[in-house]
Amino acid sequence: MRTQAEEYNESDLVVGVIPARWKSSRFEGKPLVDISGIPMIRRVYDRACMAQSLDKVYVLTDDNRINDYCQRHDINCIIITELCRTGTDRCAHALKLLEGKLFVNIQGDEPLINPEAINRLVKSFDHSIGVANAYTKINQDYKFTDDNIV
């Protein structure tokens, strides 16, 4: 996580938020699925915490099982009780609860997210635009119509 104010005033917090829901239509319980002995949400959280551009990282959930795991393992977690259709909705609700100048939405099912990708996104962010996305170029035609690739 960030140790000094780079590109921002010291009071400008950069916050990583990781939406994590239990009732996924494709894979219920995905945040707590075991990946080589470690739940997915732990892997995502740990990788996000490696991003030097982030001051704080929070898991956002509507599920007590995920919250309980996070509390037992010293992971910052916030229960979002409002009905949210998407992870982005959950992040929008969290903005009302958290202090920060810039919020980075980190997908809860990216256990191998590269912390440097987060750093590059934060560093390149243009405050006059308001929103930025990191992405990977799709090179195979079939991936354009695959609902599992977003």
What kind of feature is each model-predicted range?
Residues 58, 64-123:
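Short phosphate-binding loop-to-helix
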Residues 13-15, 102, 131:
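Residue-level preference for the first positions of well-ordered beta-strands
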Residues 113-150:
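Conserved core of the sugar-phosphate nucleotidyltransferase
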Residues 19, 105-107, 134-137:
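Short beta-strand segments
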Residues 54, 100, 127-131:
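Short, high-confidence coil segments that cap the C-terminus of an alpha-helix
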Residues 2, 7-61:
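N-terminal glycine-rich phosphate-binding loop and ensuing alpha1 helix
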Residues 36, 81, 135:
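Residues at the C-termini of beta-strands that transition into short coil/loop
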